[in-house]
């Protein structure tokens, strides 16, 4: 167990064998739910000089610097509210629940690999993170957004590498879920600027997105891909700015006109080059 006297509770509990690791942040008797903390599926193929497939836990994860990184950049208390019917009072009461969030191994690894590579190579590169259903994609996106928003490529740099982090979804429901998740991790007022429908947003229209990008409102901007076509031709162009764009459900949202307009809004030069490449590819296809 990794414990904290400040929180007066254990932060995480590990169940460790010679082949697999499982973790939970809450012990609840027979109802305890453990999650895999393996490097691969059931740690198949994992090799170690010690002979134990699980040695990465104490050799890598439980190191002093790693624990400090987990406490500073990953762990948080997630607060959820749910309305439940109170039969005695004959009305719905709001129940508040708290849960400690601790990253699973693949989430921690994904964030570290991306941040390390971006710090090494700088802006302008493309990455793909593959997540299966139920593997914590929203938290991975959230951790990555916050790490990139405060990333300095070199120790002597005066400014962060990226001017803004844009988290883009392709559906309203996903936007609301992502917005709520990212706000849970926020500790600074004005750090997050959300554009969408419903409550808890700073803007509702595409013009709000335009202003947020032009005036750098919020280190992290959350929006939907459908907002970009309406501003692609009117947004001001800042050639010296850099954006990190994190796209949820990229397999379904990164094709067609919406994606092209998003690239145009954020980088006119890149979009023009891409359009030329697309036209050339279409011409070749017609010849065939």
Predicted regions and their residues:
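Generic enzyme active-site microenvironment
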Residues: 15, 168, 246-247
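Short, functionally important structural connectors and interaction interfaces within domains
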Residues: 94-95, 201, 258
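Conserved nucleic-acid-binding Ia/Ib motif block in the N-terminal RecA-like helicase ATPase lobe
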Residues: 164-168, 172-221
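Conserved RecA-like ASCE ATPase "motif II neighborhood" in helicase/translocase motors
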Residues: 207, 211-249, 253-267, 271-272, ...
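Short, solvent-exposed coil/turn elements at secondary-structure transition points
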Residues: 19, 198-201, 228
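ATP-dependent helicase/translocase motor core
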Residues: 1-164, 173, 177-188, 219, ...
